């Protein structure tokens, strides 16, 4: 059984300590607020982020492009004799999943003895993080890449996401949950 590593996106909201402890690789999906770009490596403090949003600033996000994904995959494969399982941000919310599939196909042409399996989590934030968490548990229990990918494909449909949408009305300056 060939060793493999788990890659996911910074959209999982997993704690940095967890990522480091379990040797996860992160695909950075940057965001921009008030003209400044932020990444996993260079984040804006959470309180500052929400304070700016309360004041009316809106962040924009950027998907991973195939070149960025290929660079990450190649850096992993050059350093390690492993396969890759990438649990990607929802294809319904970003083009990153498709960029990663394109990159995986290109990189596998250069490394024909390696596999890169990209799973569309159909999830975001901690929903995606829960899938990563379970993949880590399964890997630590001795499951192989194919078994974990199959589990993810079957179980990603059982996640429920709840969101609280905040808005300001003309009649009130305070935020309200709808």
What name fits each language-model region?
Residues 2, 22, 112-115:
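A short helix-to-beta-strand connector/capping loop
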Residues 4, 81-83, 115:
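The start of beta-strands in P-loop NTPase/AAA+ ATPase cores
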Residues 5-68:
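N-terminal glycine-rich anion-binding loop in soluble enzyme alpha/beta folds
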Residues 8, 88-90, 119-120:
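Short beta-strand segments
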Residues 68-97, 104:
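N-terminal glycine-rich phosphate/adenylate-binding segment common to multiple enzyme folds
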Residues 93-161:
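Active-site histidine-anchored catalytic micro-motif
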Residues 167-172:
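Conserved small/polar residues in nucleotide/adenosyl-binding loops
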Residues 177:
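Cationic, low-complexity basic patches in intrinsically disordered or flexible, solvent-exposed regions
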